Swiss-Prot record:
Activity control summary: Allosterically activated by ADP and other diphosphonucleosides, and allosterically inhibited by phosphoenolpyruvate.
HAMAP family in UniProt: Phosphofructokinase_I_B1
Subcellular location: Cytoplasm
Protein name: ATP-dependent 6-phosphofructokinase
GO biological process: canonical glycolysis; fructose 1,6-bisphosphate metabolic process; fructose 6-phosphate metabolic process
Protein encoded by which gene: pfkA
Domain of life assignment: Bacteria
Enzyme Commission number: 2.7.1.11
Record: residues binding ATP: 11, 72-73, 102-105
Residue positions of the active site: 127 (proton acceptor)
Family statement: Belongs to the phosphofructokinase type A (PFKA) family. ATP-dependent PFK group I subfamily. Prokaryotic clade 'B1' sub-subfamily.
Length: 319
């Protein structure tokens, strides 16, 4: 293998630039040429591909977002779109591809592998919802962003004796809500992986009031439902002032934490190693601080699960 490509796809996450940097530098270290594909699979179809040098990835390790840009591409879900992408890869002489993104990005990588093109997936998503790895690139940064926001909201909640509902990202996974809620001592954490009982939530708030508690913090993953609806119901049922904050896309931005920079560097470099070893259709990850890899097919067939021990702890501490 003499020439590889790298792209980012789907939602951006802090640390993607560090992963791109690692792929480019590791490949050049081993004498390979590297081509960056802009705007994900859409850019691949369109031939938006340029050669990258060491200087191409200078001064990016600390930057959020992705220097290669990203996009969602419905066309690549079709056989025709996939064939167009493969034609572009062949046109540029690219023999292997590193795809950085979430499960949708992995599905594109899976199709390329089925067509006989060596592809390695690197988990980049703030949702932390990719099986086969303890952490995904961007999760730690997003977690710290959410914690910082809740810390500030708690100050004003206490000052005004209010209950706050904070909606965080996580359409199908509650990791961000669970970890942030536990770190911030939320009274209630509502996630897609666990059933929630509104009566129990109201009872928890009421017990706090009876103890003289000046505020309540409720963290809701967006996949469960609207934070605004939660807030409205609490206001009506408890006859109390409730405020709702939807954190939104602020969770995706910002300079990546040290943990995300190191994780991204390790995973990006490992992806290049796997291509050099002749592996294809694999995803890289980290488990118990050890780098691992798994078949993409296996990862996509495996459901995301929450850390039950952490969820149990959050329930025990929010009495």
């Amino acid at each position: 293998m003499k020439r590889i490509g790298v792209l980012t796809s789907g939602g951006d996450s802090p640390g993607m630039n560090a992963a791109i940097r690692a792929v480019v530098r590791k490949a050049i270290f081993h004498g390979l040429e590297v081509y960056g594909i802009s705007y994900g699979y859409q850019g691949l179809i369109n031939g938006d591909i340029k050669k990258m040098e060491l200087g191409s990835v200078g001064d990016i390790i600390h930057r959020g977002g992705t220097m290669l840009y990203t996009a969602r591409c419905e066309e690549f879900k079709t056989l025709e779109g996939q064939q167009k992408g493969i034609e572009q890869l062949k046109k540029f002489g690219i023999e292997g591809l590193v795809v950085i993104g979430g499960d949708g990005s992995y599905r594109g990588a899976q199709q390329l592998t089925k067509h006989g093109f060596p592809t390695i997936g690197v988990p980049g998503t703030i949702d932390n919802d990719i099986p086969g790895t303890d952490f995904t690139i961007g999760f730690d940064t997003a977690l710290n962003t959410v914690i910082d926001a809740i810390d500030k909201i708690r100050d004003t909640a206490t000052s005004h004796d209010r209950t706050y509902v904070i909606e965080v990202m996580g359409r199908h996974a509650g990791d961000l809500a669970l970890w942030a809620g536990l770190a911030d001592g939320a009274e209630t954490i509502v996630i897609p992986e666990a059933e929630h009982n509104m009566e129990q939530i109201l009872a928890t708030i009421k017990r706090g009031q009876e103890r003289g508690k000046k505020h309540s913090i409720i963290v809701v993953a967006e996949g469960v439902g609207s934070g605004i609806e939660f807030g409205d119901r609490i206001s009506k049922e408890m006859n109390m002032e409730t405020r709702v904050t939807v954190l939104g896309h602020i969770q995706r931005g910002g300079s990546p934490t040290g943990a995300d920079r190191v994780l991204a560097s390790r995973l990006g470099a490992k992806a290049v190693d796997l291509l050099l070893e002749g592996k294809a259709g694999m995803t890289v990850g980290i488990q118990k601080n050890e780098l691992v890899y798994h078949p993409i097919d296996e990862i996509l067939d495996r459901p995301h699960t929450i850390d039950q021990e952490m969820y149990k702890l959050s329930q025990e501490l929010s009495i």
